[in-house]
């Protein structure tokens, strides 16, 4: 639950790897929803320079308005808003927002929000989860939570994205490449030897010698 909550709301959701939609096996949805709500309610909004703050403000007024438009879209398209929305805090704050009954065709499930918004989606099985997770224009990062290592590796190999974290969130290292598929990046990668190779060109030289 801690990883699930932080993966959606770290930095106020203003994070290119945020898990803004979370696909949960149908028998676990009710329990997961209750536990995630309890955790998110404990988040403290406030000054990002205050060590006790969990969620700061949106970066600009325009960005706050854009995130609020996604929240309104979720409500209009039939998702159930369990908590969140606009904040009475002075400045560009948005309360951490959680939706239930999110479906794949909704705007909040198809587009990147870059705000403190989490959509909970119910799936029948891993195959449906893989299909829904793959049906997006983006492909930077995904997270898989499971006790079945074979299923974890199958999902990690199958998901069309540059990084997959298993039972954690956004693990990374300066030595490992980071970048996305589809609209989440180019052929280039940050970090690792691949970050250097994008600035290099390869050359093949054939030399005919007298002894050959």
Model-derived segments and spans:
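ALDH superfamily catalytic-core signature
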Residues: 1-103, 132, 166, 211
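Conserved C-terminal structural/oligomerization subdomain of aldehyde/semialdehyde dehydrogenase
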Residues: 44-45, 71, 86, 93-212
């Amino acid at each position: 639950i801690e990883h699930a909550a932080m993966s959606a709301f770290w930095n106020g959701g203003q994070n290119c790897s945020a898990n803004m939609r979370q696909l949960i096996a149908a028998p676990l949805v009710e329990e997961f929803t209750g536990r995630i709500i309890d955790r998110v309610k404990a988040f403290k909004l406030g000054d990002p320079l205050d060590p006790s703050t969990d969620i700061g403000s949106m970066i600009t007024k325009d960005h706050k308005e854009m995130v609020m438009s996604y929240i309104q879209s979720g409500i209009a398209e039939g998702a159930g808003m369990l908590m969140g929305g606009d904040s009475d805090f002075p400045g560009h704050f948005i309360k951490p927002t959680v939706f239930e009954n999110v479906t794949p065709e909704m705007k909040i499930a198809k587009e990147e929000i870059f705000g403190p918004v989490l959509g909970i989606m119910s799936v029948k099985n891993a195959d449906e989860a893989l299909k829904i997770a793959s049906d997006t224009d983006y492909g930077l990062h995904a997270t898989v939570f499971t006790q079945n290592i074979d299923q974890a590796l199958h999902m990690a190999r199958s998901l069309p994205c540059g990084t997959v974290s298993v039972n954690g969130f956004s693990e990374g290292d300066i030595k490992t490449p980071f970048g996305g598929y589809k609209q989440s990046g180019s052929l280039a990668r940050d970090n690792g030897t691949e970050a250097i190779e994008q600035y290099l060109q390869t050359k093949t030289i054939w030399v005919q010698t007298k002894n050959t």
